[in-house]
């Protein structure tokens, strides 16, 4: 009986000592069960990258780049980012480092054909084993957009150009430079069978656009936008 009385006297004390611990365990259990209901945290950088990957603008830029690579014959170590790009015969050591600029909008790179007898636009850079073929001949004064620059060291030796309608270039409006360089007759190596060259979107041209590689000395390159050609 003495033992029974001893236990009964101490039971409230044990209960009071254990109650805070029991409440703490209960709270932890409730927190663990509720945690999965919270939405996952996404970093701003991850969200931005995902939005860019699925945005129409990003896809359009990638499409333009892929089209330019195919038309120009340029090879890139990283085609998606347009890095490590070359044109020519790498195996023979006869090639050029290439900088790409697919867009021909307000920030585009423009020039005019300066040679008196015009210039052929070639399907490949003339290098060892290239067997370059003329796609068309541009007359003196033809306005072109430069989409790629082929360099030996730091010196531009070839440009990949596309002849575009001058009236589709916003910078040409009321610009005297586009009187000197504009639309000129184009001699094609084959009869055009598709749509004429036109702007599908600002800076993006589709249809039968005369395009190809030309020597750097055939052009007057606009050094400050489309305002004035660089001095010879």
Where are these regions (language model features)?
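N-terminal secretory signal peptides that target proteins for export/translocation
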Residues: 1-12
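Sec-dependent signal peptide recognition
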Residues: 13-20
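C-terminal motif of bacterial Sec signal peptides marking the signal peptidase cleavage site
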Residues: 25-27
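Bacterial signal peptide processing site
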Residues: 29-32
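Low-complexity, Pro/Thr/Ser/Glu-rich flexible segments characteristic
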Residues: 35-52
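SH3/SH3-like beta-barrel superfamily modules
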Residues: 55-98, 134-216
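Short alpha-helix capping/helix-loop boundary micro-motifs
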Residues: 126-133
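Short, low-complexity, Pro/Ser/Thr/Gly-rich segments in the mature regions of secreted, periplasmic
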Residues: 214-232
């Amino acid at each position: 009986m003495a033992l029974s009385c001893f236990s009964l006297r101490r039971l409230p004390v044990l209960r009071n000592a254990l109650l805070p611990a029991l409440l703490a365990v209960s709270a932890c259990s409730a927190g663990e069960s509720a945690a999965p209901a919270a939405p996952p945290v996404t970093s701003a950088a991850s969200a931005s990258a995902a939005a860019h990957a699925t945005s129409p603008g990003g896809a359009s830029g990638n499409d333009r780049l892929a089209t330019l690579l195919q038309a120009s014959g340029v090879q890139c170590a990283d085609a998606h980012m347009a890095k490590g790009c070359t044109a020519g015969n790498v195996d023979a050591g006869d090639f050029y480092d290439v900088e790409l600029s697919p867009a021909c909008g307000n920030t585009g790179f423009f020039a005019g054909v300066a040679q008196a007898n015009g210039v052929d636009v070639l399907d490949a850079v003339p290098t060892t084993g290239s067997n370059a073929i003329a796609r068309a001949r541009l007359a003196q004064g033809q306005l072109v957009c430069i989409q790629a620059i082929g360099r030996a060291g730091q010196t531009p030796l070839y440009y990949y150009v596309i002849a575009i309608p001058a009236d589709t270039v916003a910078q040409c409006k009321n610009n005297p430079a586009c009187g000197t360089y504009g639309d000129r007759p184009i001699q094609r190596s084959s009869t055009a069978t598709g749509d004429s060259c036109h702007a599908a979107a600002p800076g993006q041209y589709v249809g039968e656009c005369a395009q190809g590689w030309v020597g750097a000395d055939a052009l007057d390159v606009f050094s400050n936008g489309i305002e004035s050609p660089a001095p010879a």
